[in-house]
Amino acid sequence: MGRSPCCEKAHMNKGAWTKEEDQLLVDYIRKHGEGCWRSLPRAAGLQRCGKSCRLRWMNYLRPDLKRGNFTEEEDELIIKLHSLLGNKWSLIAGRLPGRTDNEIKNYWNTHIKRKLLSRGIDPNSHRLINESVVSPSSLQNDVVETIHLDFSGPVKPEPVREEIGMVNNCESSGTTSEKDYGNEEDWVLNLELSVGPSYRYESTRKVSVVDSAESTRRWGSELFGAHESDAVCLCCRIGLFRNESCRNCRVSDVRTH
């Protein structure tokens, strides 16, 4: 079973204290000390609970309590301690001898708050009111700035393309894109230890020579009226051949070039 509430007993006085009750409490504590606040009221002859006797003694009847208004030095000390400790009034009262936590709290709410507001200082944050209150325009600017920073990213650099198989280029890089390679059959590296055109260049040149020889043969046939059995070659020399379509001439042209 827990403790029974001290103020729910029958025949307990509640409300303001009378002078006679104050005198009884002071006389008992001076003679016997504070002791146990739960058993003190019955020993002192008071119809009060222990909590009420303790608060009456601590806040009003102690002999070391200061009477009168707070001084300017006490005001500045309370402001400084409040900026460090916040609303911990019991700790603040421990730094001010003769002042109670309840007295300091009431004095803060009735006097010091107004003094700070008149100076343009927020009593909760102890900062200037202009700095603590943010205007709607500044909030809008912050939102726009944040959106701009979130959605704007760095420009991606373009991939570097380097050609492979250039004759006059002496330097090459190891990184190329997929478009540079193309098909596997399109690029064939010439690994022979010789200086000359690449395989692609040679094959292209052979095709162009064969096409030119073929066009020349057809033009000669039409000009001299030759039949299919006789072919006229005007590439290197003029002569008649047997249904060979100037094959030897084309091969010799490719080799000489």
Curated annotation (Swiss-Prot):
Q: One Gene Ontology cellular component annotation?
A: nucleus
Cite the record's tissue specificity text: Expressed in roots, stems, leaves, flowers and siliques.
Which SUPFAM superfamilies does the protein's record reference? Homeodomain-like (SSF46689)
Q: Molecular function terms in GO for this entry? A: DNA-binding transcription factor activity; transcription cis-regulatory region binding
DNA-binding interval(s): 37-61, 89-112
One matching Pfam family is Myb_DNA-binding
Chain segments annotated as coiled-coil in the UniProt record: none
Q: Gene3D superfamilies from the xrefs?
A: Homeodomain-like (1.10.10.60)
Question: What processes in GO biological process is this protein linked to?
Answer: cinnamic acid biosynthetic process; negative regulation of metabolic process; response to wounding
Where is the motif (Required for interaction with CPL1)? Answer: 189-193
Subunit structure, interactors included: Interacts with CPL1.
Q: What is this protein called?
A: Transcription factor MYB3
Q: Identify the species of origin.
A: Arabidopsis thaliana
